[in-house]
A protein has these predicted regions:
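Extended, loop-rich substrate-binding clefts of extracytoplasmic carbohydrate-active enzymes
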Residues: 88-163
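Extracellular/lumen-exposed scaffold segments
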Residues: 55-106, 205-227
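Beta-strand-rich N-terminal accessory domains
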Residues: 19-86, 161, 304
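Bacterial N-terminal signal peptides
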Residues: 3-14
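Active-site/ligand-binding surface loops and adjacent short beta/alpha elements
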Residues: 180-253
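Acidic (Asp/Glu-rich), glycine- and aromatic
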Residues: 43, 50-56, 60-65, 160-207
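Beta-strand-rich recognition/accessory modules
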Residues: 244-322
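Residue-level recognition of well-ordered beta-strand positions that form the cores
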Residues: 45, 135-137, 151-155, 170-174, ...
Length: 323
């Protein structure tokens, strides 16, 4: 036994000596995976993943984990998974783009958001954050015509020693050359979150809170705010609570914007609730959102402090020069 341990220690020392220039493993990584998935990992543990299969109706992020392995989000409405199949955990979409519906999955005039590029230069890994950049086309299902050319960047940034983290979503939306595209007045779009069943107010006894101190759907529904938090139970442990604060950025149109939030477990940040927005190939729409994923039931002061922190971060460059 002693002899075996001696040879093992010699082997380890030898291996270490053979790699004197070995570099530390980057803590936060965006890892390309099979089947059009990019996994965002902290110290090898997946926090979330971007699903960008061109055959899907739209790209989306799932799962979304705090410090436990249980996802804080789900696919579909817990009581109507087929009718709400478009509730894809965390997703970007809109139900009135020209005359097309990109919100639902079975509309009369159906739109689809198709990923067309994830460039190698779009992946960045550091000890502080990881990101990936992609290009999506918003197309008509009927004739495949392009309505919107979207550049999207997802950044994962751990906070407080990884006890919580930001998912920052940067978007640029433009029409094809020579065209004008209109985002109609609606409460459905642009970024939305379907919470886990146990977090919902109706199903799990969770809680909604916005930046104005308003609580749950009767007070929060379609009210302007800087952010909105949805927190609830995800395990039966005494401290088994977690949540997500969805944050709007001051650079976005109509800030502070309305939040479309329901006690049944979903929340969205409205882009054009009452006022349509037009984009062209020159007049592009630049947007920035964040999700603060956290353990526990967030207080108003905690979510507000995180919102301030989010707004003070440098705005990402969506068109960096190739290295």
């Amino acid at each position: 036994m002693i002899r075996a341990l001696f040879f093992l220690s010699c082997g380890l020392a030898s291996a270490s000596g053979q790699l004197p220039s070995a570099k530390p493993v980057t803590r936060v990584q965006a890892v390309p995976m099979p089947h059009h998935i990019t996994s965002f990992q902290l110290d090898g543990r997946e926090l979330t993943a971007m699903h960008h299969n061109p055959q899907d109706m739209r790209p989306f992020w799932h799962p979304v984990r705090a410090t436990r392995d249980t996802s804080l989000t789900r696919m579909g409405h817990p009581h109507d998974p087929l009718g709400h199949s478009h509730h894809n955990s965390v997703w970007v979409t809109h139900n009135m783009v020209n005359d097309l519906d990109f919100w639902g999955d079975r509309a009369k005039k159906q739109g689809r958001i198709v990923n067309v590029e994830v460039s190698p230069e779009g992946y960045e890994d550091t000890d502080e954050a990881a990101s990936m950049r992609m290009v999506n086309h918003w197309i008509s299902e009927a004739d495949k015509s392009i309505q919107i050319i979207e550049v999207r960047r997802t950044e994962i940034r751990p906070l407080d020693g990884a006890r919580s983290w930001f998912m920052i979503v940067d978007l640029e939306l433009a029409a094809p050359k020579g065209r004008t595209t209109t985002f109609g007045a609606t409460g459905f779009g642009l970024i939305a979150v379907r919470m886990a069943r146990s977090i919902g107010v109706h199903d799990g006894g969770g809680r909604i809170l916005n930046s104005e101190g308003q609580v749950n759907e009767p007070q929060v529904f379609r009210k302007p705010a800087r952010w909105c938090d949805y927190s609830g139970r995800i395990s039966n442990d005494a401290d088994g609570f977690a949540g997500i604060t969805l944050m709007n950025h001051p650079m976005n149109p109509h800030h502070p914007t309305a939040f479309h939030v329901r006690d049944d477990g979903w929340m969205g940040c409205c882009l054009s609730l009452d006022t349509p927005l037009e984009v062209t190939d020159v007049k592009k729409l630049r947007l920035r959102y964040a999700l603060w994923v956290h353990d526990g039931v967030a207080t108003q002061a905690e979510s507000e402090a995180r919102w301030v922190q989010f707004t003070q971060l440098p705005v990402a460059d969506l068109h960096p020069r190739k290295k």
